[in-house]
């Protein structure tokens, strides 16, 4: 998972059997025995130490360090009002203080619990210290979790060896940069990926797909990418084998050629599983390319939980799981993308990857399902990204749902399957910001929500408006997501949002370049952007987009927003007006409440700064050279 190791320094050891000191540059690590505990100094100031939570009848409530049958326990000290951030894509409060968080990738089936698709055992404190556990195994974090200890960070690592980084930085930006220096920087995504991505589950056939694409262009809707989800181009019973459903796509080339003629990029779906009903299953099993069952020595037959499926998304077939630890299987899967890219596909939606859930599973590498489970996502991401690097003429770029430490090297990720309601919108924003605080700079959500769609036009509008300021912007869910399907008022508001998105592309390009160089996400939480403002940290739903824009998404019906602006003067951003008035200026260090009209946004620029804007275009193949500065 590491792409490099830290620069080695000359270590100086002093001490005896009871106490040992290790000096390295500005750092000094003091180790004590009986029981083992430590203090970490930087420039002679304690920056972290073992938890000091004592107990009435014993020395420690929890051991500072311990090796158990389940793995390792490490307990770190927390200040009384100390916040902790990171730990991957999480839907609840960004400040993990008080939470029990598990670093384990789930098919979360929503955004309503602690379970999530993208995890990494990396956390940081505004006080400057960072913890990164370098392991593929599950890690449980009791972050000031009161049933364990409200004054300690308790880390339970389910591994035989303990490999962890504990370091200190002067700012959250430097903290994330250090973590990314270890695990890998994200390449800059192609410009077209910053445009609008249109999708749904799912276009029934080529006639519907082309009809929607033509309507998009006829209505002058800004859009760059159209997506064929899993059931849109594959036969569900026999997927996945890189085969077009012959009953609907006897010859897919003319269909893709027509989409190309309309200046669409094309995204197709995949998952790393092969139906037992496909001849490829027997071939892959014979070659040892599938995850095996320890009990039989044969390919493990994965059986789906049928409860999430219904009339639209029908049950999936029993399947084998591709073993990415087998070099030949990895190469086969990568090379199998070549015909898709040669046909005109530009992007892969790499779905699933969380299915190694059973310790009876065994990989070619000798790892069990539990040990391989998390890192499998990263191997899957890497394989697909390498295929795009090798064969895609317009990429590489993909959307992956599951991710682990290092997956940020293979952009980008999207936030799984949110419920189509206001809670789903709010949780999706938090998930995006949490992933960004964990080293993942590029993210998208399902605009409108994925499941339990009630055709709530106001929700759809607000979701689209918030997503204008995310790294990537995708309209997706069960059922149509074209703006006009929500009525005239919603369509007008979303069209305005999409037009603004394209005008912001020069600004967003700069933000993605900075993300690639520094690890700072396009969407930055207030805690990350304003680490020295304790009040700003409390506003977890608003965020910075790039360096200049504070975005206050509307996450409740009726248009009410509550927000805080840091110190200084701020100007309300309105790309349609190049001359802001005194009424558009807001004093910082204050809290505000407003009611927004359906077409209104609460976005602010620090007074004196400018935002570069491009022209109004419908896709990135159009001339975008003319730029202006706002204001």
Place the predicted regions along the sequence by residue:
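Catalytic and substrate-binding clefts that recognize carbohydrates or anionic sugar/phosphate headgroups
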Residues: 4, 11-190, 200-201, 206-207, ...
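Conserved, mostly hydrophobic/aromatic
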Residues: 26, 122, 216, 259, ...
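Flexible loop/turn segments at secondary-structure boundaries
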Residues: 131, 138-142, 202-206, 232-237, ...
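Secondary-structure transition/capping motifs at alpha-helix termini
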Residues: 186-189, 217-225, 250-267, 292, ...
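Aromatic-lined carbohydrate-binding/catalytic grooves of carbohydrate-active enzymes
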Residues: 187-366, 408
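Aromatic-lined carbohydrate-recognition surfaces of secreted/lumenal glycan-active proteins
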Residues: 194-200, 228, 260, 264-277, ...
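Active-site-proximal helices and loops of the catalytic beta/alpha 8
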Residues: 230-233, 243-308, 360-397, 412-413, ...
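Catalytic core of carbohydrate-active enzymes
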Residues: 385-396, 403-414, 427-428, 435-445, ...
């Amino acid at each position: 998972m590491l792409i490099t190791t830290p620069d080695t320094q000359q270590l100086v050891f002093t001490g005896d059997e009871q106490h040992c000191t290790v000096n390295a540059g500005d750092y000094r690590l003091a180790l004590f025995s009986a029981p083992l505990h430590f203090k970490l100094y930087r420039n002679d100031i304690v920056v972290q130490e073992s938890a000091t939570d004592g107990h009435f009848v014993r020395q420690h409530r929890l051991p500072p360090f311990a090796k158990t049958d389940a793995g390792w326990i490490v307990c770190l000290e927390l200040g009384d009002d100390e916040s902790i951030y990171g730990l991957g894509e999480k839907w609840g409060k960004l400040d993990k203080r008080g939470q029990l968080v598990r670093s384990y990738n789930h098919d979360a089936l929503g955004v309503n619990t602690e379970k999530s698709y993208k995890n990494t055992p990396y956390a940081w404190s505004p006080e400057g210290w960072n913890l990164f556990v370098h392991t593929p195994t599950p890690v449980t974090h009791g972050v000031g979790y009161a049933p364990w200890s409200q004054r300690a960070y308790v880390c339970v690592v389910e591994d035989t060896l303990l490999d962890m980084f504990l370091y200190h930085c002067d700012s959250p930006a430097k903290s994330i940069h250090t973590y990314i220096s270890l695990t890998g920087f994200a390449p800059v995504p192609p410009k077209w990926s910053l445009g609008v991505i249109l999708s749904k589950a799912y276009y029934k056939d080529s006639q519907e797909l082309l009809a929607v694409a033509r309507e998009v262009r006829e209505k002058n809707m800004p859009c760059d990418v159209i997506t064929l989800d899993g059931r849109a181009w594959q036969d569900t019973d026999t997927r996945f084998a890189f085969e077009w459903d012959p009953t609907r796509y006897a010859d897919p080339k003319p269909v893709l050629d027509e989409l190309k003629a309309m200046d669409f990029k094309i995204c197709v779906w995949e998952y790393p599983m092969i139906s037992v009903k496909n001849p490829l299953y027997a071939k892959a099993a014979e070659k040892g390319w599938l995850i095996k069952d320890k009990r039989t020595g044969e390919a493990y037959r994965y059986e789906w939980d049928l409860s999430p499926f219904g009339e639209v998304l029908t049950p999936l077939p029993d399947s084998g799981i591709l073993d990415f630890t087998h070099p030949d299987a990895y190469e086969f899967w990568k090379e199998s993308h070549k015909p898709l890219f040669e046909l005109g596909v530009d992007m892969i939606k790499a779905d699933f990857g969380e299915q190694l859930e059973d310790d009876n599973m065994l990989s070619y590498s000798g790892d069990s399902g539990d040990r391989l489970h998390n890192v499998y996502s990263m191997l899957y991401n890497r394989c697909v990204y390498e295929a795009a690097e090798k064969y895609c003429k317009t990429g590489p770029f993909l959307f992956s749902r599951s991710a682990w430490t290092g997956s940020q090297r293979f952009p980008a990720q999207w936030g799984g399957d949110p419920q189509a309601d206001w809670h789903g919108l709010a949780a999706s924003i938090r998930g995006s910001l949490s992933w960004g605080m964990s080293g993942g700079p590029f993210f998208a959500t399902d605009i409108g929500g994925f499941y339990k769609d009630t055709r709530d036009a106001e929700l759809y509008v607000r979701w689209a408006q918030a997503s204008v300021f995310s790294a990537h912007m995708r309209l997706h869910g069960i059922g149509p997501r074209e703006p006009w399907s929500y009525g005239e008022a919603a369509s007008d508001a979303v069209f305005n949002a999409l037009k603004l998105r394209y005008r912001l592309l020069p600004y967003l390009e700069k933000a993605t370049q900075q993300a690639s160089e520094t690890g700072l996400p396009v969407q930055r939480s207030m805690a990350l952007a304003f680490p020295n403002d304790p009040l700003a940290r409390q506003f977890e739903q608003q965020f910075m987009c790039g360096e200049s824009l504070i975005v206050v998404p509307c996450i409740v019906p009726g248009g009410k927003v509550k927000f805080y602006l840091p110190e200084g003067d701020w100007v309300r951003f309105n790309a349609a007006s190049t001359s802001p008035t005194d009424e558009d200026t807001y004093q910082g260090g204050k809290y505000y409440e407003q009611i927004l009209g359906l077409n209104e946004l609460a976005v602010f620029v620090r007074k004196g700064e400018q935002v570069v804007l491009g022209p109004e275009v419908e896709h990135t193949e159009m001339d975008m050279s003319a730029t202006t500065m706002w204001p």
